Amino acid sequence: MTSKLSPNRSSSNLREDSVSTLPNQTLIAPELLAPAGSLRNMRYAFAYGADAVYAGQPRYSLRVRNNEFSLESLAIGIEEAHALGKKFYVVSNIAPHNSKLGTYLKDISPVIAMKPDALIMSDPGLIMMVRDAFPEMPIHLSVQANAVNYATVKFWQKQGIERVILSRELSLEEIETIREHVPDMELEVFVHGALCMAYSGRCLLSGYMNKRDPNQGTCTNACRWSYDVKAGEENETGDIVLTSEINKAVTAPQVVIPTLGEGTPSPKVFMLEEKEKPGELMPAFEDEHGTYIMNSKDLRAVQHVGRLTQMGVHSLKIEGRTKSHYYCARTAQVYRKAIDDAVAGKPFDSTLMGSLETLAHRGYTEGFLRRHAHHAYQNYEYGHSVSDKQQFVGEVIDRCEESGYAIINVKNKFCVGDSLELMTPSGNITFTLNEMLDKRNHSITDAKGSGHQVRIPIPSDVSLNFALLLRNLDEGVDTRNPFRKAPSAVTPENASEA
């Protein structure tokens, strides 16, 4: 999809949360690009508004441990995407060692024969090999190539690259400068998902600690683990060692200045011990916040969709090939509305920020799009994803012909009396659950948890294709119950797009 703004536009004085177009200027929607770790994720992403998805073969992409795609499923995914008028990109962005070069063309040839819309690549050697063997194959430059300036983008344009996925470490102003200097190159920008504290994911922590190389797709997310902290000191040779009981009282503390110039200097040196690996110690420094040493918050840039659209960015990308189909559906739904509103010239809908709060996350940040103090990037509270707004509790698999009730595959426990949200591609309904039946149509009060199946009443005129069920955790959630009215009474009051 090509997305450009008509000439002579400047957005330097426009707010990030609004869209304003001048006469004779037409905004074209950027592509909404969603992650696909599985065929199911792909299908939900498309149902909720994604224009394209990206997926990879495990051996050659950076998602080896959580990737359900094989040659057979890639073929199915590409065929289904094209049947819907959507696009499917195949990721091939590892930093390959010599051992993988000999088999690469043999392994990628059947994938290219499936006619994906592009390969996402980062290594110049692999790019050269594909260019020589398959000169007509479109190539997008992966974020792993660290394109952070317009000269780099121009270089790759001369190599025949059709699109550059810009590094996450860029500000809005830097992205706009690149757009102005290379107006005829397609640009792609990450707008949502996990961030890495290393430069665009080029990290060795997992490889150092677990012999799992992140640059070969086997990252174990060691940066997000929980660590015990023990007192340390610098010895006479400059090594960091455990502080002994004998010299603890006389050892001078090591004052550590925060690298970003914010916060209180730390008076201590520590040794970190991962709880699952007792006895293996790693030196580190700590300030007043805690010991999550490289645990980034998650990127959320929905409030900047308007400005990125004005710049003429071609594709807005969501990270998350290891996430659930619910994650793919919710993020696609929210960013679809943000893009459509931007193109229509509507102001930013701040409720979209709240919709993304319902996803499990590690805290949100704007990343580098705007500059912040260091605590705005780092998560000091937890190493896993959580949400205190909503919980994904089930997926709708069918409608019972006899009762008209929705048949739910339960993922997490919920009960009669709970505030629920039915999420569908056409809109969302919030209600209080008044009744629940088991598979034998016996009345029950709670769905026990994953592996169970229950039936609940749903208005008959609501399409249940790709519908998901969420439990609201906020006590203040407004629960207008559609079941107190006739089944057809799904009104703007109780059905709204997220």
Name these PLM-found stretches.
Residues 134:
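Conserved phosphotransfer cores of two-component systems
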Residues 63-80:
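Glycine-rich, positively charged N-terminal anion/phosphate-binding segment
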Residues 149-151:
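Conserved nucleotide-cofactor-binding alpha/beta core module
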Residues 125-126:
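Alpha-helix capping/helix-boundary segments
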Residues 2-9, 13-47, 52-59, 78, ...:
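Surface-exposed amphipathic alpha-helical tracts and adjacent flexible/coil segments at the periphery
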